[in-house]
């Protein structure tokens, strides 16, 4: 009996089962112990293969692919700390709803806890973060193939969001020619190999029913809060709120067009919050709210009913309102709960939103990161998409810009880490094939710098804007101790990115004014390559501009 041959047949069943559950993209890191999985993936023509040498970046690449494709994405890594590097992407997927299938190769049980090389305790290492965890046995013909395929099908068939960890131990030898070992074991799956359906088909998940008293609540004074959702959902939510005559507070990720722009500014005005207190119901569609003032208002508001609609399961309200948690696809829920045409009940808020935007426009000429955040909608590629980083940049765009309704916006706003942002943006571009504008800060770019290798392979123009404010300037918005702020919070690195771009053979520009930036963008959108645009700005100007605008709008 050939151990290596049966390892590959065992792996082939696993990989084929994944294809029946909609997996098309598979991300592979180099490794020896994962050889059976890698070769099985390479031989399966149903997969689109992606490779990367850094497992942490690989996990985030898969995350980006899953964001756009809306399908589960598989990841193959070898044993040891390679597995641990997938933790950040797994955590993010669990919070934002992407489906990741982590296939982690492992040493067999007799090599664990005995000093064997590259052997760690992998089963259960991700704690409660995976939706499902499977610790497969060592490949053996004593276990029928139908057990293996049905185990995979059950985990994926019941997966609505988050990750599945499938730990796969393989004994040596890992290499060798294929023979007939295990062929009859594999063939016992019969004509399953010829069709395209799962071995085990799970019943679909039941979602929340129609709220029978909706006809009553839609006649009340309501507020719509729009969090993270798809571009198509964003347009529908905007129309729904407009028909109801309810004010819509749209997050940067809502893709609603933010009909009341600069919400994080005008929510700091007492006139706005006073008017919002008249709301009898708040309907929040989507989670992951960004703006600080929005979160403060959301925590303090006390309507008669607070409804949260999102297809992600679990509690999504850190303010713990009394109300209803409705698990449903947002577009489907809107169809079940049609709007009734009514006149807008808010008078003060539209005026404040207009005045807040005018205050922002009055400051748009200076060359700085706050002004870039406001102007970002002017720089979006046609038929393209936007990827927004974390920390200060997403807050500035949320507060100062107005993105087009239905324009795709992606981010990692689940755990909101700055790790893996470039890798995620690479996945977003690959899955969509669209021109992509990505914007991150300098520390975020440094954190995931080797992901520039992934950005060499794009199918449409990709522009990476690195806003270099020399450190974590978001801490300038917080009451951090002044004497310790620079050394222990901001951590300025005093670096530029020209040589990093050159190392990976990417185009690079460092504009000094808006005209140079716009010229660089026009050039970048012409060719299907990646262009790094480093925008060097005064360190605290962005945070200070936001604080000045907050003070100004609060007194309107």
Curated annotation (Swiss-Prot):
Cofactor note: Binds 1 thiamine pyrophosphate per subunit.
Species the sequence originates in: Escherichia coli (strain SMS-3-5 / SECEC)
UniProtKB keywords: Magnesium, Manganese, Menaquinone biosynthesis, Metal-binding, Thiamine pyrophosphate, Transferase
GO BP term, example: menaquinone biosynthetic process
Lineage, opening ranks: Bacteria, Pseudomonadati, Pseudomonadota, Gammaproteobacteria, Enterobacterales
Family listed: Belongs to the TPP enzyme family. MenD subfamily.
Record has Manganese as a keyword: yes
Assembly with partners or alone: Homodimer.
EC number: 2.2.1.9
Function text: Catalyzes the thiamine diphosphate-dependent decarboxylation of 2-oxoglutarate and the subsequent addition of the resulting succinic semialdehyde-thiamine pyrophosphate anion to isochorismate to yield 2-succinyl-5-enolpyruvyl-6-hydroxy-3-cyclohexene-1-carboxylate (SEPHCHC).
Obligatory cofactor(s): Mg(2+); Mn(2+); thiamine diphosphate
InterPro entries, per database record: MenaQ_synth_MenD (IPR004433), MenD_middle (IPR032264), THDP-binding (IPR029061), Thiamin_PyroP_enz_TPP-bd_dom (IPR012001), TPP_enzyme_TPP-bd (IPR011766)
MF terms in GO: 2-succinyl-5-enolpyruvyl-6-hydroxy-3-cyclohexene-1-carboxylic-acid synthase activity; magnesium ion binding; manganese ion binding; thiamine pyrophosphate binding
Entry annotated with the keyword Transferase: yes
Primary enzyme class: transferase
Gene3D superfamilies named among the record's database cross-references: 3.40.50.970, TPP-binding domain
Reaction(s) catalysed by this chain's protein: isochorismate + 2-oxoglutarate + H(+) = 5-enolpyruvoyl-6-hydroxy-2-succinyl-cyclohex-3-ene-1-carboxylate + CO2
Record pathway: Quinol/quinone metabolism; 1,4-dihydroxy-2-naphthoate biosynthesis; 1,4-dihydroxy-2-naphthoate from chorismate: step 2/7; Quinol/quinone metabolism; menaquinone biosynthesis
Record protein name field: 2-succinyl-5-enolpyruvyl-6-hydroxy-3-cyclohexene-1-carboxylate synthase
